[in-house]
Design a protein with these regions (language model features):
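Radical SAM/AdoMet-radical enzyme domain recognition
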Residues: 1-95
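Short, solvent-exposed loop/turn segments at secondary-structure junctions
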Residues: 6-7, 31, 68-70, 98-100, ...
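Alpha-helix boundary recognition
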Residues: 17, 55, 85, 123, ...
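Short, conserved loop/turn and helix-capping segments at secondary-structure boundaries
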Residues: 41-44, 109-116, 176-181
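Generic alpha-helical structural signal
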Residues: 48, 78, 116-123, 184
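Short, hydrophobic secondary-structure boundary micro-motifs
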Residues: 63, 134-135, 195-196
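A C-terminal junction/extension of Radical SAM enzymes
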Residues: 97-167, 212-214
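Flexible mid-to-C-terminal extensions adjoining Fe-S/redox cofactors in radical SAM and related proteins
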Residues: 165, 170-215
């Protein structure tokens, strides 16, 4: 479950332990300054509290990190990686900033040079040359390992808060709702079939996204 952590408390953790089948990916974006600048004042403190609770209760969790042109160094530094390990997280997904919505800020998108840096940095952190016990995965730059874009029902799709089924968390179009359609019906709907038939969107799996790199 991907979460902003704000609803994780002691009773919730006890219920998760009872269930025994849930892991969490906590959204965090570097230092208190870089994190709260994007996610709102007080969010960093909420994540720290959630990490402490999850670690105390022995609940498996990792991180979900959005890297931007401004925070890329803060969220990939050795210091930050070791800090996450100390808090109890040992794996996580990186997502580069995608300009979606009415308040999108395209200027926050990583530069080509920064994307190249991320490719090299993630591979180093996963290598035997690195002694930090944290395993990072990059939603964009690891496309070569999964055959390109995994969205549109190929490996996953997104359900928003209204129940609308969307090809990807970053692509807000839908022609089916989970409340009145089965998973199979959603996957066979015109939008999802068009997505399916378009795969792969680029032979270069380092450029897998149909919205960002192959519009």
């Amino acid at each position: 479950i991907y979460t902003n952590s704000t609803l994780i408390d002691e009773p919730f953790c006890k219920e998760v332990v009872r269930l025994g089948n849930i892991a969490f990916m906590l959204s965090i974006e570097g230092t208190p300054e870089t994190n709260d600048a994007r996610r709102g004042e007080g969010h960093y403190a909420a994540v720290m509290h959630a990490m402490d609770l999850l670690k105390e209760h022995g609940i498996l969790f990792g991180t979900s990190i959005c890297y931007t042109r401004d925070n890329i160094e803060a969220v990939t530094s050795d210091e930050f990686m070791r800090f996450l390990c100390d808090k109890g997280a040992h794996f996580g997904f990186y997502f580069h900033y995608m300009p979606v919505g009415n308040e999108a800020a395209p200027e926050l998108m990583p530069s080509p040079e920064q994307r190249k840096y991320m490719i090299q940095r993630i591979r180093y952190l996963r290598s035997e040359a690195c002694d930090i016990p944290f395993y990072p995965m990059d939603f964009q730059n690891d496309g070569e390992f999964v055959g390109g874009c995994i969205a549109g029902g190929r490996n996953y799709f997104h359900i928003n808060s209204a129940g609308d089924a969307e090809p990807c968390v970053f692509i807000h179009y839908s022609n089916a709702n989970i409340h009145d359609s089965s998973i199979l019906e959603i996957l066979q709907s015109p939008l999802f079939m068009a997505y399916h038939n378009g795969q792969p969107f680029n032979k270069n799996h380092l450029r897998p996204c149909p919205m960002l790199e192959n519009p």
